[in-house]
Amino acid sequence: MTSLPIILASSPLRNLTKPCSTSQIPKPIQNSTKQPPIHLLTKTNLSVTISQLIITSPVLASESFDSISSDPSSGKIDLESILVTIDNFFNKYPFFVAGCTFTYLVVYPAVMFYLRKYKPISAMNAFRKLKNESDSQLLDIRDVKTLALLASPNLKFLGKSSVQVPFSENDEEGFLTKVKGSFSDAENTVVCVLDNFDGNSSKVAELLIKNGFKEAYYIRGGARGKNGWLAIQEELLPPPVHMYTAKNVKSSNNNEASVVGTEN
């Protein structure tokens, strides 16, 4: 039978109670790389998670790409998407687009032309207006040399007279002063403007409206142009309002003199 001291000496409890030397204490394993701070790891993991979520979700991905393409801070415009949108709108509403185009190109100019107070007028309609409207007058804006070769229409037959004021683009104020001096009541006067053709007459008609005249019409073709006063007077206008050239005046005077001589 083994004695008690021998048993205690060989017991593991005795070995545990012995203090360990410092050389026998195991050292912790040290990593060769340093660990980053915990808050950096948190931010990195969060950003990676969000990016993965966007990529895996088709709805969020499309919204993100749309926001990038339409981001005003980038300073870029997606012309292709704009053109596609316009094309889709035209294809979806063709009648609306056609109506807007017709209104802009046809209706609007026609309404503006009708509402404005200076308009073109044919020589025949100008004669009718001078005949039927008491407040209408004829303004001849041709220069002095032209008036010497081709006189203004004689309106004594209508109880009126042609007003002759040569127009000069370099002296519009002086021209307006003379015209207003020739018509006592400009606000109630309708003026038919006659030129050699119809180049300056439209400018004068617009100028008169801007300066207080009731209405102003510029005669199409003027005195010498196509369908002008000279062109229609033989067929459509009565002889008292005809325009005569210097040759016609001389020939008419010679004919009268010859008639008087034969009678004597």
Curated annotation (Swiss-Prot):
Residues 1-60 form a transit peptide. The keyword Cell membrane does not apply. Residues 132-232 form the Rhodanese domain. One of its GO terms (cellular component) is chloroplast thylakoid membrane. Gene3D superfamilies: Rhodanese-like domain. It is found in: Plastid, Chloroplast; Membrane. Its main location: plastid. Keywords: Chloroplast, Membrane, Plastid, Transit peptide, Transmembrane, Transmembrane helix. The chain crosses the membrane at residues 95-115. It is a single-pass membrane protein. The keyword Transit peptide applies. InterPro entries: Rhodanese-like_dom_sf (IPR036873), STR4-like (IPR044240). PANTHER family: RHODANESE-LIKE DOMAIN-CONTAINING PROTEIN 4, CHLOROPLASTIC (PTHR47377), RHODANESE-LIKE DOMAIN-CONTAINING PROTEIN 4A, CHLOROPLASTIC (PTHR47377:SF3). This is Rhodanese-like domain-containing protein 4A, chloroplastic.
